[in-house]
């Protein structure tokens, strides 16, 4: 029986070989492989690296194969396949009806908008306009809890 580590290497190699683009909720073939493995095994995203030594569940093999085929052949984003994406550490449900939460602006928010905003104060009002599903507004609200978003 293959371990999670073995499966991780296999799935990552398949994603790399498929010539896919990354950055739709997951930044690399490795990140996408982890997400697919955990979703196929029906495990939450937060896992210890000790899981890598554990056997990959036999009952998850078919789900993993189907998910990988959809990603590689149909080019669907992993966020749609697994139903979630993370932006600045915030979990968002995700499917084909909305854009995958992703934006380099999220990093600016987590860094307190430095160097564009004075560190001694926080913004009082933040507007998320025409940025997709409102994910940047949600991230802003977590980064600046005293602001009206």
Residue ranges of predicted features:
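N-terminal auxiliary segments of SAM/dcSAM-dependent transferases
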Residues: 2-87
